[in-house]
């Protein structure tokens, strides 16, 4: 089946998107003295008017929590390296966006804190959303290394193609049943667009092969995986599997034919950057109800989507793929946790973080359904602030949706999550530190 995308934006709305209601740790503090500034490190595109948005957020946080927020956005291409340098040095960091596999490495390096007691004391909104077990699911031997963002819990590998080119070359998406069916499509489009990359790939793990995999890598696919994760707990050599051989062979053939960029092995650009520049036809990506909104709003193009499966799989990375951790460098982890938990329960702060300031960066077009759009004269190219990565922030389910979004997006996201098939290893993360490699004698 094919999905046609005709929407902008990436987050949704609850019925109280315009409010700033929050509970538990969000109650007004009686603390006195100078407010503590919580430094939150994100990844994405630099925002011209970031300071203006910080001021608006701090107008909320200071009277509520005696705290302020300093947003640090690291560029996609160098974020991992920059964050590692920040954590290794004396630079002040309080909260950081990461994933379970990387967070475990930070944990063993002593660069992040155990969040268990912080959740107990300040994680009221977190526990209301997830319950205590899921709020603490990202842990090893009781050390909680991060808390999950409110996002889709499963995904379906799919092909995303620019809709204008699908229509221009009369591509029949009903004939696309599995990845190998894309070869004829690439051949057709490349003949008319010889300077365009047919399929995205980069050197930082964002490859067609990784996007197509339905294996559960248990936090580190390089050391083994569950190839039939919903039915078996047998760990297999991922690289020796029939699926890997067949898929890698297909992709190598496509590379030789020029469908994949010749610099894929050294490319560090994010796919959004390449697509926005008009140089990309398609990519394999995980489909869920929110991707149609995110793709067009972040690239300016509508996409035709063809999922390769009917149901999502919820596996070991579903609650650890995107998390927030508290850095060891934090000078006040209690205040950092208070601010983080507040954001999980505050539509007002979530909207500021993701969309900017109402009336300047966006206007509300449909209050009942929480739909917003750019003000007159403002576009994606000249907006002062439009972070537009709601999935990277704590709780996108309580924020506004962009014009063209399904009014029931978050209800459908919840239904999508509920429809998922669970991996036999759900909740497990492999701890690579347990493996000791001996030098040969």
Question: How would you name each of these model-derived features?
Answer:
Residues 2-438:
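Extracytoplasmic/secretory soluble proteins
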